[in-house]
Amino acid sequence: MAVYLDFENHIKEIQNEIELALIRGDEDAKEILEKRLDKEVKSIYSNLTDFQKLQLARHPDRPYAMDYIDLILKDKYEVFGDRHYNDDKAIVCFVGKIDNVPVVVIGEEKGRGTKNKLLRNFGMPNPCGYRKALKMAKFAEKFNLPILMLVDTAGAYPGIGAEERGQSEAIAKNLQEFASLKVPTISVIIGEGGSGGALAIAVADKLAMMEYSIFSVISPEGCAAILWDDPSKTEVAIKAMKITPRDLKEAGLIDDIILEPSKGAHRDKFSAANTIKEYFLDALRTIQQDPHFLDNRYQKLMSLGSFVESMN
């Protein structure tokens, strides 16, 4: 059963009416209701608040990494383990083909259903997950394969065991190594881009965000609790943090925004998957045509956080 957010109640009501019209076999009513539905969707989704966009980024029906991998990656083979400690199910790694282009795909997977969510640790990777991702990146470099990374995590796992096994070192190592990979790298934030847990697989030649995704240094609730000592100030925190694709594109922190289907990726995962596939192929062609893409990647990364201080 589809899940509707509070601001989608009118959409739910019209959708229910359409289903009743189908049961009655009333094609005329169905056609009228579908036009009304399209109008309502455009009205709601063209006036979303930043808080509502956060809700969409976390929507339980939103496609996860495995959904996209199943839809766009052919002849795929999953690779497990980090060769050091364990296999982290929160990060998935595949070799396969996207439109006959051999690729390596690395994704953060939250899981569906109680058992699978627990297996995936709710998409919060441990150090072995990031080392597993780095192992696959080095594999891609060895065999000259482009890399597609799908980012979707609330953050790296903050447990004691993760810290004891070097969580911060694993993330820092990925930042260093991914910055110097000699193959094209493309990263797409498909849902939540939470802090260093997201950044560990977001250092790339092209960094894009889905239209209703977020990218932040801390959760808005955490920010509200720390700065305002009040978790209910989440909406205030969201505006201050500027975590939406539009804000981050204006700040020069991401390269592109991938538009979603009119009702959001959670209502049409097939169209959403196709747009990611087309973006990847277009971005890959652009990178491959640039003989200086490694230098350009380095310059882009070095420019982040730079500022000019004037003396009065």
From Swiss-Prot:
SUPFAM superfamilies per record: ClpP/crotonase
Subcellular localization, as worded in the UniProt entry: Cytoplasm
Catalytic activity: N(6)-carboxybiotinyl-L-lysyl-[protein] + acetyl-CoA = N(6)-biotinyl-L-lysyl-[protein] + malonyl-CoA
GO-annotated cellular components: acetyl-CoA carboxylase complex
GO molecular function: acetyl-CoA carboxylase activity; ATP binding; carboxyl- or carbamoyltransferase activity
Top-level taxon of the source organism: Bacteria
EC number: 2.1.3.15
The entry's keywords: ATP-binding, Cytoplasm, Fatty acid biosynthesis, Fatty acid metabolism, Lipid biosynthesis, Lipid metabolism, Nucleotide-binding, Transferase
Pathway annotation: Lipid metabolism; malonyl-CoA biosynthesis; malonyl-CoA from acetyl-CoA: step 1/1
UniProt cross-references to PROSITE patterns, sorted A to Z: COA_CT_CTER
Pfam family, one: ACCA
GO process annotations (BP): fatty acid biosynthetic process; malonyl-CoA biosynthetic process
CoA carboxyltransferase C-terminal domain location: 36-286
Primary role: Component of the acetyl coenzyme A carboxylase (ACC) complex. First, biotin carboxylase catalyzes the carboxylation of biotin on its carrier protein (BCCP) and then the CO(2) group is transferred by the carboxyltransferase to acetyl-CoA to form malonyl-CoA.
PANTHER family membership: ACETYL-COENZYME A CARBOXYLASE CARBOXYL TRANSFERASE SUBUNIT ALPHA (PTHR42853), ACETYL-COENZYME A CARBOXYLASE CARBOXYL TRANSFERASE SUBUNIT ALPHA, CHLOROPLASTIC (PTHR42853:SF3)
Family: Belongs to the AccA family.
Subunit structure comment from the entry: Acetyl-CoA carboxylase is a heterohexamer composed of biotin carboxyl carrier protein (AccB), biotin carboxylase (AccC) and two subunits each of ACCase subunit alpha (AccA) and ACCase subunit beta (AccD).
Protein name stated in the entry: Acetyl-coenzyme A carboxylase carboxyl transferase subunit alpha
Species name: Helicobacter pylori (strain ATCC 700392 / 26695)
